[in-house]
Amino acid sequence: PKLEKIVVSCGVGRHRDDKRFQEIVTNTLMKITGQRPVGRIAKKSIASFKIRAGMGAPIGHSVTLRGARMYEFMDRLINVAMPRIRDFHGAGAKGFDRGGNYNLGISEQSIFPELGYEDTAILHGLQVTFVIQSKNAEHSRALLEKFGIPFEKKGGK
């Protein structure tokens, strides 16, 4: 198995028309990853969410990390940010998909030391996806454990 890329993304939800919130999310992702995020436009129209395909403001922002920046971000995530999560018992073991990729949800961005107090005035979550070239989830989990990601024990906590 091989770690191909890390995608850090954040959906803006009901704040998609709020320019200030969009700016906060963009600045947060830029400070955390060191790269400028790309706005994601809706692919499908969903009437109940008042979203039209390809129209209006972005519904989310994402950054794709590869190479040295990917490993640097992973190191900061594992050694600095994860220990700062309140009531953290390990990363969830259910975040693997069939292809062996791993998804990690972070409930608030304040765990990253790059962000100051004014950057965390409005809290929002992040999604971190580890795209792994692997045959199954067991191989991917073993790879991520070697990198140092602490997973929950099999029996719960």
Task: Map each language-model feature to its residues.
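Ribosome-associated RNA-binding proteins
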Residues: 1-157
